[in-house]
Each structure stands twice: as structure tokens, then as C-alpha cells.
């Protein structure tokens, strides 16, 4: 998913989903905002072409006979089982399509885990960044001919936080065909 916050809103909204029976989350919504921000930053840093993958989604068809089970309980059991097996935070929604012929779960999950303790890096001296966000060694390297800092260049002052890491690297197993 390249817009996890938008997708979560879409699958969990009664206004957007006519036949929404239950929504279950293993973490707070704030987690997804931070995750999206982290993934976007990592994507820019990597210089990769294409779209940033902020999270993944599985759409799981269920037998129509499952409509006999309590929706909240069914979704909670399913989602907690996934989290327990893969250690991934999830949000899930239980739906029917418009014609009520396809009972299914939307399961959105993260490829990253929240670190027990965030890694916060503080500048031990002034740090200079050029227009591309690349760290350069000296202030001279970001000055224009007029002696002023060029547009889009920046300085992180000594003592300021320049990097805050809240999540682990992505779990590669979610990219493999064997996972599916």
C-alpha cells in the first residue's frame, strides 16, 4: 500500500463501506501515521524509483457460512492469530461486497516492528545539507555566490535531533511468494 492512512480510512469507514460489520486494530492509529512517515523517509533515502510501500494488505475471502459467527469475535480471533504468528501490527475490517456475495476480511499489516527504545541521533556539531538532502562537511558547500545559504539547503544546529528511528528494517519474508 502506498497510502496506508487513506486505505485504513477507506476500509474502516461506514460512510465508504455499505456492508461493514467489524473493525479491529492491534495498535493505535498514531502507529500508522508514524509508520507511513518512516517508510516515506526511508524510500526517499534509498533513491528507489516507483512507489513507496508503507504497509501491506491481504484480502481474505471467507466462506458464506462464516456469517453465522459473531463478526467482532471472528475478526478479533483472525487478526490476533496473524499478529501472533508474524509479529506484525494489524488493522482489519470485515465486509461484504454490495451484492452480499463475497464475505471477506481486509487485513492491513506492517512490515516493520516498533523498536523497544527509539534511536535518537543528536548533532554533536552543526551539520550541513545540500539541496538534495545530502550531508556535506562544511558550510561553504551550501553557500551561494552572495555568501548566503542556497535555497533548499539546510543546517542542523549542534544539539538538535537530526535522525529519529522508531522502527526496525522491513521484514523481508513478507515480500516472498512462500509467505502468500
Please provide the spans of the model-predicted regions.
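N-terminal nicking endonuclease/strand-transfer module with a His-rich metal-binding environment
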Residues: 1-180
